[in-house]
Amino acid sequence: VEKIADRIGGNEAARHALMRGVPEMTLAWQDEVTGVWLRARPDFLPQSCIDGEDIRIVTDLKFLAGTHCSPRKFSKAMDDFGFYLAAAHYSEGIKQIFGKYPTGFVFVVVEKDEPHTVSLYYPPPEDIDRGRKQMRQAIDLFAACLKRNEWPGYADRPMEVGLPIYARMRVDESTETDLTRAIWGEPEEEAA
């Protein structure tokens, strides 16, 4: 833990992103459309959000495997793990509680394993907007489920689910290779 703290503290931008604020403050509010109660718990809420200052940048700390820390891999992780949804949800909670949306959102990404590299990424505003739209749909669906007391699963009726394309290709290729070997034997190596 000390090594990770040292790595974060050694990164000037990360250090500033985690200064002057409140860690893990719980925000709770009632959705204006559905009346459903919502909550969020940002990793770090800057004092500037609480005080209503002009610059309000929220920080979300992510500890990830190194395979998710490069810009390209983090882009995929934003989708896989819904980080853009969290940014949208936290932003909405901050607006509801403090009256203004954050002016920015930054992910401080730390590799779980040594050397514990630290990277800072921010989602473009249009991705946070996408997250807001999805959150709106999710809240509306949740409210409808509450009202009806019906909680549908992924497939309430029989549904065909097949192998993904990559698995089909792998199986088909290995089956063809195995069949060829069974009929013709191992291929002979060409003479040099």
Feature-to-residue mapping (PLM):
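Metal-dependent nuclease catalytic cores that hydrolyze phosphodiester bonds in DNA/RNA
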Residues: 1-41, 155-156
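Short secondary-structure capping micro-motifs at structural edges
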Residues: 30-33, 41-42, 74-78, 91-95
